[in-house]
Structure formats: C-alpha cells, structure tokens
Amino acid sequence: MISWISGELVELWQTNQKFFLLINCQGLGYEIQVLESLFLKLKTNQITNKNITLWIKHIKKEDSDLLFGFSSKDQKNFFIEILNIRGVGSQIGMGILSKFSISEVINAINTQNKKLICSVPGIGQKMSERLILELKSKFRNELKIQEEKSKDEFHIKDNKINKIVSDIELTLKSLNYTKNEIKSILPIISKEIDSLTKKEKDTSFENLLMLAMNYLDNDSSNIVR
C-alpha cells in the first residue's frame, strides 16, 4: 500500500483532460495523475528538478496500476469517499476536486446545489442526486460545522468587495429568493469577484447580480420560491 510519494519532479504533461507528473523516487519513475490546480501551479512556476510530496491513492485494475496524487491528505480522503459511491469512477472524482475545493463541495451538498455538481463533466442529474445524498451522510459533522460558519463565511476584509456581496444578497432577498438559494450562489459570486480587476470591482454590481439571477433562474432543481 502506497500512502505517499516524495521525490524529484522530472516532467509534467497533459493528455486530454488528464494531468500527469513523473516523479523520480529513489531511482524509480512514478507516473501520477494529479488535479488540474496542482498541475497548473507547477507548470506556471516552471518547477522541475525539485522535490515534492504527494498523498497517493493506488487503484489496481486488471490491465494497469493507476496512481492518483494529492497535495493534502484531506483531498486524498475526500477522493476515496467519492470513489465509494456506486457508479462514480476515478475521473469523476478528479473532476470534482479539480473544479471545486472540498469546502465548496460540502457547501453544495449542504444547500443541495445539484446544478453546481452537474457542472462537472460526466455528472448528470441522477448522479448529482446520488452524490449529494451519499456524501451528506458521510460528511454529517463537516456539514454541521459548515452551517454554523455560514453566517460569517463571506465577511471579506476588503470593504468594497464585502459591500458588493452584501448588496447582492440583500437584492436577491428583496426579489424573494430563498435563503438556501442565496447561500448556494455566494461562493460563485465571491470567486467571480476575486478574478476582477480593481476598476471592474467598482462597476461590477449589476453584472454580478445578473449572473446570480441567471444562475438561480436557470436552475430547475432549486426549491420553488
């Protein structure tokens, strides 16, 4: 059983939507599939000939041995929990963790945001329902903590950004969107704001509000208002 691998990064490459590293560990070359976020970080920083450590999930098949590497033990454990769900394969698991952080997935489970889960390639309506149902039982404690922190989750230090988020939240409330609907859209709005320039942040309220409304109105799985 391989728990982790620590060695020299030799090469990194992409095959379709899969991202790989080659690591030299004591003279052996390990080909490891990693999350897109880690791959891009290493590629952007042009890091080679440097030691890195990855938490490993080893999947043995009839015709191959597959290694999946993660930068944290939490990511690895979350990946394993996803694989334990019937009908969910390794590429679905990698797709979920490549697109969202663990806290974002837990928030989507807590708010039953099926559309967010369905945005991962390969996940349809039925699979999203199964993922939410089964992960909700597996991460009951984490969901309770998430719910307790939800009120403070989006208190941002930048006053201008915090005001934009608060204004959007108040506007959505005035338009009769439910608390759960608003809670489900705030991580997306916050992520969108993070990508804006300083000039864009001064003029982005209307665009972000429209983004939120379009997202919620097009989500047929949301609770009826």
UniProtKB/Swiss-Prot annotation:
Has three domains with a flexible linker between the domains II and III and assumes an 'L' shape. Domain III is highly mobile and contacts RuvB. Keywords: Cytoplasm, DNA damage, DNA recombination, DNA repair, DNA-binding. HAMAP family: DNA_HJ_migration_RuvA. It comes from the Bacteria. The keyword Transferase does not apply. It comes from Prochlorococcus marinus (strain MIT 9312). Residues 1-71 are annotated as: Domain I. Residues 72-150 are annotated as: Domain II. This is Holliday junction branch migration complex subunit RuvA. One of its GO terms (molecular function) is four-way junction DNA binding. NCBIfam families: ruvA (TIGR00084). GO terms for cellular component: cytoplasm; Holliday junction resolvase complex.
